[in-house]
Each structure stands twice: as structure tokens, then as C-alpha cells.
């Protein structure tokens, strides 16, 4: 049996700037190690609706 696979979980990140502007949000799914990164993840990703890179925040 594989050891240590239970620490990495799949999360969804959502654009924060599109919500403020009233435009459709973009969502990405990625993985994170919950042992090393306990706080919410913030990444800069491309939002095709706004046609620019924006801050994406982890959602539950």
C-alpha cells in the first residue's frame, strides 16, 4: 500500500476579482499538501472572462 498519499488533497480555487465586478468566475482545481500548507491557498491564475491574470482563492 502506498504510504503518505493521504496528505495531498484536491482543492478548488476561484477568482476573487470577477465576483467584485459582477462577471462570471473562473475556477481551477489543483492539489495541495495539507500538512505543509494549512492556510488557504492564494494563486495568480488566468481568468478568460476578464482576459487577464487575477488572484484565485481556495474555496471549500
From Swiss-Prot:
Tree of life domain: Bacteria
GO molecular-function terms, A-Z: structural constituent of ribosome
Keyword presence, Ribonucleoprotein: yes
Any one of the GO CC terms: ribosome
GO annotation, biological process: translation
Alphabetical UniProt keywords: Ribonucleoprotein, Ribosomal protein
Family: Belongs to the bacterial ribosomal protein bL33 family.
Record's protein name: Large ribosomal subunit protein bL33
Amino acid at each position: 500500500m502506498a504510504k503518505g498519499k493521504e496528505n495531498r488533497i484536491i482543492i478548488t480555487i476561484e477568482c476573487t476579482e470577477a465576483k467584485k465586478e459582477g462577471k462570471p468566475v473562473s475556477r481551477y482545481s489543483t492539489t495541495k499538501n495539507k500538512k505543509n500548507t494549512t492556510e488557504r491557498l492564494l494563486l495568480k491564475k488566468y481568468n478568460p472572462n476578464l482576459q487577464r491574470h487575477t488572484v484565485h482563492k481556495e474555496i471549500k
